[in-house]
Amino acid sequence: MKKILLFLFFPILSFSQSIDHLFFEKGEINFSFQYKNKLQLNMISNIVSIDHKTNADLAYAYANQKQFLAFIKLGIDYEIIEKKIIQFENGSANNWSYYPTYEEYVDMMTSFEDSFPNICKLHHLGTLNSGREILIVQISNNVGVKENKPSFLYTSSMHGDELAGYILSLRLIDHILNGYGNTLQLTQLVDNIDIWINPLANPDGAYAGGNQDVWSATRFNADTIDLNRNYPDPQDGPHPDGNLYQNETNIFMGLADTVSFTISANMHSGAEVCNYPWDTWSNLTADDSWWQYVSREYVDSCQANSGNGYFEWSNGLNPFANGVVNGYDWYEVIGGRQDYMNYFKYCREFTLELSDDKTPDPNDLPELWDANYPSLLNYIEQSLFGLRGIVTDSITGLPLKAKAEIQSHDIDSSHVYSNLPIGNYHRHLFQGNYNITFSKNGYYPKTINATILNNSTNIEDVQLVPFSTTQVKEINPSK
């Protein structure tokens, strides 16, 4: 039995109608409105959550009751979109053409660790007020041991009704674990990268209608907050949405404080496009060429492996995008996870919009996997490329946490740091020649020159000389 989404448009509500009734069932509504220009759209995006389907003059948005009342005060005409849902019939677990119950999801995540204890560890990041958990698996050949490896992160479905990445992430975990030792690429990834995958970042939204299925999923979390507007923002600072940081937000910020991720991706659905930074402002990143390169690489592979017009997004806002877009050029997002990771955590994160259907027909999920899994693996592999090495004290040989900054290049927090306890740094760059300065309080800075080739690795270990060594030599010149 097919699930049919019927979008019914209703005219402006009279003020005599109860706003409470609109929010009784889900705590959020979906609506559309005409906007005059990008400036007005960006202003409105500070009030409500703009959705992916927005085009050159018509915007789609989500709002909780507080946000919707603020939007009404603008005096802009709108139409409520009521979704009447008839459930899809789940396919087979054997070919991943189904959405699990919440309990099945937990069992699957547990079974990954139980079946592959030498290379997989399940982390319980936190329990929500509902009792549902934020779960993540870590995959590495020496799982749980700090090594000279880049750490990579995939998360999906922080919008609870955007579930294409939920199943793809589960299948990706299964694919990597079963392929280790049997497939060269998968073995090399596990041996050389610390891989973290969280398939479901908003379980309360995904299972808003109960643990038995996802057909009543909501975009927002249980407190009707858009989690992708709830992070510290490079431009607007802490609490840009005016809300407390949600439990889910605190959990993932805590993870990013604990693990120094170098590359990550945040999976959504509702469009088919690779969205790279920034979302919050029009500034291009220092590494815009690199972002366009890896985004294009992801999309080109998807297009080649689908053969049916998949991932060819464009609209009136960017008619030449062909599946790749700068976030701000599309629409402004304030408080997004992507910009938080890039600006505050020095991690290269982009946003993957994996399907025009937010919750695809389960029977379409195998085809979605076939189109995406080579790209998902290739993006993980990007963790190995660029400039990398270990920074140590020239006297003691001990590892250092030092800043690595590229002269006349880095802007807006695009520099990186070496990470303890190893002292390893990872700087992902588009091909070219760069002067990189390493610095730390109490040490003389050191600048090196490095030539970078795309999809290649340049290893440059660096020793920093402490000030105290020079002072001792000056006092005791004979030594």
What is the predicted role of each segment?
Residues 398-400, 406-430:
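Short, acidic Ser/Thr/Gly-rich low-complexity loop/linker segments typical of extracellular
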Residues 3-13:
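Sec-dependent N-terminal signal peptides
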Residues 431-442:
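A short, solvent-exposed beta-strand micro-motif common in secreted/extracellular proteins
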Residues 441-467:
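Structured interaction patches on ligand/partner-binding surfaces of diverse proteins
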Residues 146-296, 300, 304, 308, ...:
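Active-site/substrate-binding loop(s) of hydrolase catalytic cores
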Residues 395, 465-479:
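Residue-level detector of functionally pivotal "anchor" positions at catalytic/ligand-binding pockets or at interdomain
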Residues 264-286, 320-381:
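Active-site-adjacent mobile loop/cap segments within catalytic or ligand-binding domains
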Residues 387-394, 423, 462:
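A short, amphipathic beta-strand motif
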